[in-house]
Amino acid sequence: MKLFVLAAIIAAVSSDRFSSQSQSTGGQTYPSPWQVGKQYRYEVTSRTLAHLQEGPSSGSAFKAQFTIRVKSPGRLQAKLENPQHGNFNEQLPDPRELPVDLKYQPTPNIDKVFEIEIDGGRIVSLDFPTSVPVPQENLIKGLISALQLDTSAHRVIHDSQNNYDREQQQGLFRKMETDVTGDCETLYTVSPVASEWRRELPKFANEQDPVEVTKSTNYGHCHHRVAYHFGVPVGAEWTGTAHKTQEQQLIGRATYSRILTGKEGPIYKAETTSTVHVHPHLYGKQKAEVYSHVHMELISVDQDSGAEWPRAGAMRPAQSILYSLSTKQMTKHYESSSSSSSSESHEFNFPEQHEHPHQSNQRSRRSYMRSKLVTVHKVLKKRNSESSSGSSSSSADSSSTYINDDIPDIDEPAYAALYMSPQPHADKKQNAMNAQKILQDIAQQLQNPNNMPKSDFLSKFNILVRLIASMSTEQLSQTSRSIETAKTSNNIIKSDMWMIFRDGVTQAGTLPAFKQIQSWIENKKIQEEEAAQVVVALPRTLRYPTKQIMTQFFNFARSPAVKDQMFLNSSALMAATKLINLGQVNNYTAHSYYPTHMYGRLTHKHDAFVLEEILPTLAADLKATVEYKDSTKAQVYIQAIGNLGHREILKVFAPYLEGKVEISTYLRTHIVKNLKTLAKLRDRHVRAVLFSILRNTAEPYPVRVAAIQSIFISHPTGEMMQAMAEMTHNDPSVEVRAVLKSAILSAAELQHPRNFYLSRTAQAARYLVTNEEFGYQHSFKFIDDSYDEDNDIGTFVISHIGSEDSLLPKDFKIVTNSKGGAWERNTIEASFSSAERFLDYLRDSVFAPHPKFDRAHKYSAEKIAKLLNIKNDEEEPLEASFYVDFMNNQRLFSFSESDLQQLSQYISEYMKKVESGAEKHYTKVYNQDQVSIMFPVASGMPFIFKYKEPAVIHFQSKLKGKFSFPSKDNKYYEANMIKDVQFTYAINIDGNVGFMDTLSNQYSSVGVVNKLQFNIPFKFGIEIKSGLIKFRVEPLHPDQDQTLVHYSVWPYSASQKKDSLVAISQDPATKIVERRSKVFSVDSKYGQSTHAVIYAQGYTYSSDWRNFGAKFTSRDYFTNLASLLTQEDIALTHFNLKHLCKQSQSKALTITAYYDEYYNQQNSGILTDATDRNDLSPNSETRRAEMVKLVSAGINKARVRVVDLSASFEGSQDQNYVLTGTWGDSPVDSKVQGMLFAGTKSATQGNQQINAVFATTKPEIHSLSFSKPLQSDLRAPFGMHFKYGQSGEIRVSGSFDRTKKYTTELENHPLAKQCSQQTTLNNFYQDSCHKAIVMAHAPDHVEFSVSFQDMSPQYRNFSYHTYRLYEYLGYWYTEANPLKLTQNGKMDFKIDFSYFDRTYTVDIASPSGEARMRDMPIATMAPGALSFYQPLKAYELVANYFTGHQYQPYCSIDGTRIHTFSNRSYEYPLSRSWHVVMQDESTQRGNWHELAILSRRQQRDQQEIYISYKSESGQDLEIEIQPASGDSAYQVKVTTNTKKITDDDLTMYWDDVKEQPFLQYHTHKDGVLVINIEDDRIRAIYDGQRFVVFTQDYRNSTRGICGRMSGEQRDDYLTPEGLVDKPELYAAAYSLNEENSDPKTQELKALATQQAYYPEYKYTSILRSDPTWQEESQSCGEDQWQSETVYKSRSYDKHKGACEVRQQVQFYENHGDICITTSRVPSCQSHCRAGDYKIQHVQVTCKSKLDHDFRMYKEQIKKGQNPEVSGIPSVKQFKVPVTCQP
């Protein structure tokens, strides 16, 4: 009985639900295409297929007869009859059509009777038999969607363009409509059909004209979306159309329907077509297409008088025709109001959209200018919305918080993530078994890298990941236990099984996988570095970052199981905070990166757990570490807090940035750098903070430069950009000026739409930037994005912060953003408090002992420091960090000084371990990028796009070595190591586009796989000795051929069974897309002559290879490299580079490099022509000695450098290649000579050699004069002789000259005029003169003749080949004259340089004709490269050009001016007091040199020099130099503990420890004394009146009148007592009150002491305002000024009278005040209305609401009284009536 009653209730409810749905909306009845009592029969066909632009199509088709019976209004019965289904994968004439011979099979479980509820032509709901599976249900929904025709006003979007004439049945309107693909905006058009419709509907040709209805869906505006997505790149639009500048169209999706229907029914024909276009590799021109077409055509319409079809058992309701993932009905949470026009996709705006809110304010200026109208009781305020930032403003929650499936439980796998099709929610028992089989298979494949591309290792790894992702916690735990035993196995294959499984679990991204990783760490299955590498990958692989998971992850990162493990502790904390940023704080990634369309937002947007739990905990941890002065941990916590990217981190960092909590400059810089994550959200607050720090010139420059690096990420406003451009002119810090210039100029070149605002603002400021040139060592930021409309390779950013104590940067960073990246990807950053100190510390820890100095010097550095009270700067703690974000690993390795001590100990321990033998086995498999997008198409089947970049690193090595450190017995470091290496790196770029045929469980797809693999299987040996490095390499497996490099591209079409365990490439049904002809192919062997055979084999069908050079057109190397791995024209490509070990007779290669220098060589004779050498053996001491002797012949006290390189191929028949070069010159001889020997020694090919000699004579050099070199000719003759073969030789003779034309140009150049002006003031070596002197020693004309004998014809036509080369390169200024010939065997060359025009011209005359290349470009630094100037070398002059004279800086003590190392020039003539030129008493580890240089003038034109120097090797010297008197030489007195070895024209003292000259000095021909201390460590030139010193050491540590050598001119005002502003005070402060000092100088010194002030840093306030200004800004701000509030008057008289204007005192309340008018104001009573209004200015007086009198006055006014008030008045506007009317 109970069952009967229950059945009756259910039937009643069901019938009531159907009967209550009438075919009307809002009382208006709409016609239905379905007439009661009729039966409609349709022919149904459906096809869905995938295809590339060429090649086979893969898909499926469905056909059936569809019968609809209308039994009552709004209720239909329907049934599919004879349903059939077929699959195909073949080449088709039309890729969208079906094969003619397609074979169909019956389709089960779909021919059941089901019911449809309609409202007019709109489908309301469905009832299915429970025996109908969900996949079949979705197919039916796709068919039913095609028949939906709703021309009613239901859910029409209000729009003025909407129109529909029901009588004429024509119109166009937009409405929200639900079909199987989603509830989205649909554009209806209703129109007549062309007369030819009868051909289309021959069976109904006699019926009245039908109407054509078309529908087009806008997927950018949906209230309910059925989709799954994960990992979608930032800015990639796939739901709709990319309209914003920062968006790119990733997927193009469209659904179009066409219906032919009678005016009152029936529907004769309905077609729905869905198309999806996407490039398999995300971006590119050649898109893949998934095409879905549903076709329904009416066969007959009959009267239906039969009984209803009986129900096929129990029924299952479907509340809508949306695609379903389960039988469970998911609730939709959205308003379906017809007036709704908000778009879900519009709710999640990019941060850039709000980055310039003032721009939108400008557009709405008029509305702001309008006066606001409020009542007198209430003041309304308008507030601008905040810019997007953090959790509060990135983007709003969607108005459609729908869900399509339940979020997986912590113990459940992610079913929807696999195919977005219904999955049985139960473990498959075979999963564990299949996973183990695949593990064994791919672990075995990993041992044979040659076959890895063919066996498709990486694709199989992703199959393993899929299996793991489908496991529950229990099943995964069981599987793990069975594999964990292999972890400690000595078997390589078993060990690889564990590591691959470990990485598979990491990449699965499911909650059970996360739980399993936690278990591993807690149970110490993985620890420290191994665990760290697993944990750091989780932020990019976890697919469901719920609040529970994020808090659990964070707490786990702080648990004892993690915190006590090295490497894991910091990595886990950063991974947890990065996940919290992606999943919660950054609302854009929280929506677009994770599957929110499937499950809704995974955490509530306004959940405060980040502010209440996460951030306070990290802030407390940071505070504690700072109090304990633990820099290492502090860096980690700063990085973790920065990772969160929430605006509230500014409050956490504020005390440290404001200086309230004392920390080092390095940590403050670290804080500012870690604001970048917040800056990426374009947060206005952080942008303001960064700009404030930048503008504060009292901040340390590293902090300011770090702010610049981040402010460009936040996209500064136009005003900020213009201010920064102006700062490039006047900012006191050269580092700030340099980085601003480089950043603005590179930002102006950006092309990607996402950088539109940044690029435009930079372009507007570009021309405001300074023309000052900055050195490469200064701070800079370079940004490049290689972009075109269809190809987005990525962004390349390189930046660094310059150092004051080194040319090495304090911070160096490279960032590459890939096209699939959401965060900064592939980031490498090294940061130091001082790079120089860091390297010195490491070096000293191993090599350098502290020297002891026994002898006291007259003026040692220590004594001078005491005399002048010079105190070394208080050194900040030594801190450093290395940050790497690579292979999905975000790692921070931070160091303090104590850590460096442990590091040196670790290195020592590792060396000891290596001596006994060390083995390493490492395997890492990961997905560098992965993107998944799935949604249904018209047929009711899910479209699936998956992009992955799986990669593997496999490394096995054995290392054994021996190390010898310097000792008493051996002064040199020696090492000998042997290492066996098997290294494999492989990556696939795998994009797959298709759909899941849910009827046959067949996955039809097309795709492209790019494969790249490197394999290094070699045994290496290295030997290091004094001056010798020997490197040996041999095959690890000499009996096997090895594939060293593999590259291939495979476009394919496939049809696979769902959950197939076979890789697509190995499936027999897969078809490769091929073309008819190859574009390029190679099949060649190289290296036969060396018996080491390299085989290059391959081919390509891609047109990209027709012009391979086009891939190298970008400004940066990263883009050029990335372009090699991508194809614009996708086509089959396959290349291999192999080492054929079996065919190679050479079994090993030994490379030897030897370098040595010989000093004071005295050999009589002259350099003769080149002759053959007798000794051709590698590394021959005999040959080197012979060549040293020959090259030094005739050179007085020659210094000879020798380089000996050799390569020996060892085997059954050795093959040796040798290259030996020697170079001889002398500081006291003008001759320069060189020799070169190149030879081969082969048992099969015999011995061959080429010998060459070179000789030139340097021109006369004038080191300190610009005018003297111009008065004499500059000429340097040279000659060369080459000998080759039996009788072949080449002889070259020519000269370098300076022409009169160039001399005249130089004399008239502005630089020369500046120098002349300085020279008249007795200043010969200021900046302008230095540059002019260098240019005066540069030749501008080179002319030489080449005569040859027995030269091959191809070399004789050199001029012709050179001409053709330049012509090919695009130099249009080339010309040839084949009639002007030289005699046979001779060629003439002329080269003319025009340095000021930056061009050069080449003339070549040869026996084959004359060629001339005119006005070709030349580098600006050419004069320095070609200059003969000494004592600087050519490479130093070039380096100085690129570093602003900071590579080899100089200081000159001139006649009346001093030029400092940092290029400051100031007026100061020396007095007879000793002045400190340089003083450095370095106590830094690794830098134990002590230096003091003093200078004074006893007479006006005579300067005396004193030098004290102590080296780290324990050698010391004192030099006292006095000017020459009359014709006598300079008086040089040297006191040293080293031995003098020469004492005539070149005096030399020898350092026995370093085996090199300790001191050299000589007088040059121009009368200048040249001094060289410790082999160019310090160089000086002196002519009795002026003294110039060159050195690149002592940066930022030296003191004296030559400045700090920091590169900052502002530092050259610092004296021992502080900063002074006058140059005479600065120089006098470094004078000594010794030896008859000058009284005037001492007076200046005393004055400097009085006026000196100490520099101090003043830190920046972080968004801080005083209360008064804050209050004033609220009441007097721009909004109030532009939109003054207008108050509306009213009468409070309660007695109704005639409607006339009454006078009434008014009041209003504003904030905490009561304001009352001082006079009565016109008003109307409440029962009257104003006839007209006017604005009247009225005086008001305001007092606090707490004021008793004003509260009383307010009550009186409300009673209609008019009290009189007094006080300070202000004027306000009131809207008052002119007349009052009833």
Curated annotation (Swiss-Prot):
Glycosylated and phosphorylated. Detected in oocytes (at protein level). Produced by the fat body, where it is cleaved before being secreted into hemolymph. Sequestered then by a single class of receptor mediated endocytosis in the ovary. Residues 333-367, 379-406 are annotated as: Disordered. It is found in: Secreted; Cytoplasm; Cytoplasmic granule. Residues 34-812 form the Vitellogenin domain. Residues 1-15 form the signal peptide. InterPro entries: Lipid_transp_b-sht_shell (IPR015819), Lipovitellin_superhlx_dom (IPR011030), Vitellinogen_b-sht_N (IPR015816), Vitellinogen_open_b-sht (IPR015255), Vitellogenin/Apolipophorin (IPR050733), Vitellogenin_N (IPR001747), VWF_type-D (IPR001846). GO terms for cellular component: cytoplasm; extracellular region. Its main location: secreted. Keywords: Cleavage on pair of basic residues, Cytoplasm, Disulfide bond, Glycoprotein, Phosphoprotein, Secreted, Signal, Storage protein. Precursor of the egg-yolk proteins that are sources of nutrients during embryonic development. Heterotetramer of two heavy and two light chains. This is Vitellogenin. It comes from Bombyx mori. The lineage of its organism: Eukaryota, Metazoa, Ecdysozoa, Arthropoda, Hexapoda.
